[in-house]
A protein has these predicted regions:
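N-terminal hydrophobic signal-anchor/signal peptide
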Residues: 1-83
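Hydrophobic alpha-helical segments characteristic of transmembrane helices
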Residues: 24, 30-33, 181-188, 228-229
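Short, glycine-rich, amphipathic interfacial segments at transmembrane boundaries or analogous
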Residues: 34, 42, 102-164, 223-241
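Residue-level signature of the cytosolic catalytic core of signaling kinases
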Residues: 47, 58, 62, 162-165, ...
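Residue-level signal for cytosolic alpha-helical hairpin/rod architecture
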Residues: 51, 166-170, 241
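A hydrophobic, helix-centered structural microdomain
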Residues: 63-139, 186, 252, 257-270
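A short, structured surface patch at a secondary-structure boundary
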Residues: 144-219, 258-266
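C-terminal or late-domain output modules
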Residues: 210-269
């Protein structure tokens, strides 16, 4: 697709690019001295006219295939290695508080599609949000905690520090990130990646700005650029900026760096 618009139509150009992003259509812009921010581009010659080709990602073609193969191989190895630990954690969760060991939710993944998300349950079952858990009562308790708590991480979906709904075992799992181990199965099935943006909830997504919907251009990850360099200390806007930076600059080497950095972050209990 080739688009030639003046600088006064910059918003229009942005909307076109966002709409075709998931189709991976090649996108060229014949520029009049301006370009879109936060987008990787390269100059191209089209019939002796200089145009900018906007890239959907730095990771395309064979690199994308390699990333998927990398995800399958290492998630399978990790599942085999950590399976005894996961079974032991599941037992401890059941002993610590009644209810299932696995907490299942619908999250928003690639192309904005819902997928089944797994993690170890870290809250009391009757206080966990979800129709199959605490239901409307749990949702009302969450809203009241948001209003009454003095230490809330702001964003499209606020998060409570020192959340009283979290179990004793849950606090340990969250601090060590062991609650995320079941997501290895999501990686193996292809709904998640080892590295990518944080998987968000449908109620978060409905409040996204147009630009933030770029987060749906790739699979969400167990860990990611924002998780490593900000973890839970970031508000949503800053988290989204880091994840958008990753999407535009991702590569196999950047993924490897993030994975190694994740071990350091988890070890420090950040």
């Amino acid at each position: 697709m080739v688009v030639a618009v003046g600088s006064f139509q910059k918003k229009f150009l942005q909307e076109i690019f966002e709409k075709i992003r998931f189709t991976h259509t090649r996108f060229y812009h014949i520029s009049e001295g301006f370009f879109l921010e936060d987008v990787v581009y390269t100059p191209e010659n089209i019939d002796n006219i200089v145009a900018l080709e906007y890239k959907h990602s730095m990771l395309d073609g064979r690199s994308a295939v390699f990333k998927r193969a990398f995800d399958i191989f290492f998630s399978l190895i990790a599942i085999l290695v950590f399976l005894p630990i996961m079974l032991f954690i599941a037992l401890l969760i059941r002993l610590d508080s009644p209810g299932p060991a696995i907490y299942i939710q619908k999250r928003v993944g690639k192309r904005g599609e819902l997928f089944t998300f797994w993690k170890f349950r870290s809250m009391y079952t009757h206080l966990s949000v979800g129709a199959e858990y605490g239901g409307k009562k749990a949702q009302d308790i969450y809203k009241n905690l948001i209003k009454s708590s003095s230490n809330v991480r702001q964003g499209v979906l606020p998060k409570i520090e020192n959340d009283p709904r979290v179990t004793r075992m849950g606090r340990f799992l969250r601090k060590t990130s062991l609650d995320e181990l079941p997501q290895l199965f999501c990686v193996l099935w292809g709904t998640m990646s080892l590295v990518g943006p944080r998987p968000h909830l449908p109620e978060e997504v409905k409040n996204y700005e147009h630009r933030q919907k770029r987060l749906f251009s790739i699979n969400p990850g167990i860990t990611g650029y924002a998780q490593v360099f900000g973890r839970d200390n970031l508000d949503f806007e800053d988290e989204a900026k880091l994840d958008l930076y990753y999407i535009q600059h991702r590569s196999v080497f950047l993924d490897m760096y993030i994975l190694f950095a994740t071990f350091g972050v988890v070890f420090k209990g950040k």
